[in-house]
Amino acid sequence: MNFNSSKYISHLPESLLPNDASPEWNNKADNAWQLTAATLVGLQTVPGLVILYGSMVKKKWAVNSAFMALYAFAAVLVCWVLWAHHMAFGTKLLPFVGKPNFALSQKFLLSKASTNYYLPMADFVFYQFAFAAITLVLLGGSLLGRMNFYAWMLFVPLWLTLSYTVGAFTIWGNGFLEGKIIDYAGGFVIHLSSGVAGFTAAYWVGPRTSNDRQNFPPNNIIHMLGGAGFLWMGWTGFNGGAPFQVGEITSLAIFNTHLCTATSILVWISLDMAVYKKGSLIGSVQGMMTGLVCITPGAGLVDPWAAILMGALSGSIPWYTMMVLHKKSPFFQSVDDTLGVFHTHAVAGILGGILSGVFAKPKLLRILYGPYGSGLLYSYFDDNIGQGIKQMWYQLLGAVFITIWNVVITSLICILLNRFVNLRMQEEDLEVGDDAAHGEEAYVLWGDGERMRLPLRRDISPIIPYISHQRHSFPINKIDE
């Protein structure tokens, strides 16, 4: 259709006519949905993961865990527009990364996003930032309860620059695997990379204190569920925004996302009840996460029946690796992955990537990408099994590349940082937690008989003047009413 033709423009309602604020190429529906989708993805992190992390950890780490997520979100946005966006989606510098450049000029941000997207570049930049930000925050889930916050402040921009941009450019940008791998919304780029990098960084940072490893109850399960709700509903924008247009792929992706997730939760709960004789709310949140992650690389490219099957597998295979294999394997036991990000994101991400290579429907691939390969299952029935095998080879190649790159680069970043700043907090601070790290605590009232803990950090506390150089708090008996 020729959208420049006066024949079509003359029949448009006045509200849809092009003007100075909305040029002819701008599809207002696509534009509005993309801004909504990007906002939903942002809400997955702030407040979603901020609440989830702050509630899922031991009480003494609530502030630090939430703060790590909030900092990463802010830092990634600044780095993204200053250099990282063009490294991920700009002009090719190397086969796996683009040239760093600003994404700040009005001319650039208000230009058409691409030949296939009828919306401003600003929408694309913001949506991709939200993807990058949540990747760093997911990675941080492996490091909660011991990483030095100053080291985290340096780790975030380094990992974004040296790792995330490479994965995004290689698979989604103009890299050597672009157009070959089926990764609809980030099963490899976001989830496999965050799971592998988080596990690797956890190795270099070292474990939590022995007491924290053995006794690490969530401080507020109900709040944790609220954060999980932001994640689940926010995935409507996560997978629904990936086509960058309002169409049938968007609708199918959203439907499949929630169908797979619900199936995964039910399977996880069933396994918990079969083995441990009772269901677990924390376990159901883990099952929710694995379902969301597994469907992500193929959300708009598979039929609903395949989404149900993917949900069944994402609720069982990561359950086995986390609840059985992790406890038996000396390898897994040697690395303290605080929230099990390796299982919920790396295992579920690679599972989803492989299953997307099996179940991707040729018609849906053509609608979204144009000329493309075919899933293994459909290539078998179409008498073109060679094409399906080739696609599976690319899926495996992508998984191997993302895994190796993240292990190597994350290790180098941690080794480099450790030469300038300690990766983990001092042992005495690890015993105290938030009060030592930030001079703040999550809850004023806590424990039997309810005790009030007042921070003694003089530059923050509005209640008492400077008393001691120690940044710890002391119990004050609650005044009898």
Curated annotation (Swiss-Prot):
Gene3D superfamilies: Ammonium transporter AmtB like domains
Annotated localization: Cell membrane
Induction or repression: Accumulates in roots during colonization by arbuscular mycorrhizal (AM) fungi (e.g. Glomus versiforme).
Gene Ontology cellular component list: periarbuscular membrane; plasma membrane
This protein's UniProt keywords: Ammonia transport, Cell membrane, Glycoprotein, Membrane, Transmembrane, Transmembrane helix, Transport
One GO-annotated biological process of the protein: ammonium transmembrane transport
Inactivation phenotype: Normal arbuscular mycorrhizal (AM) symbiosis with AM fungi. Plants missing both PT4 and AMT2-3 fail to establish AM symbiosis with AM fungi in high nitrogen conditions, leading to premature arbuscule degeneration (PAD); these phenotypes are not suppressed in nitrogen-deprived conditions.
Glycosylation sites: N4
Physiological role: Involved in ammonium transport. Required for arbuscular mycorrhizal (AM) symbiosis with AM fungi (e.g. Glomus versiforme and G.intraradices) in low nitrogen conditions.
Family of the protein in this entry: Belongs to the ammonia transporter channel (TC 1.A.11.2) family.
Protein name: Ammonium transporter 2 member 3
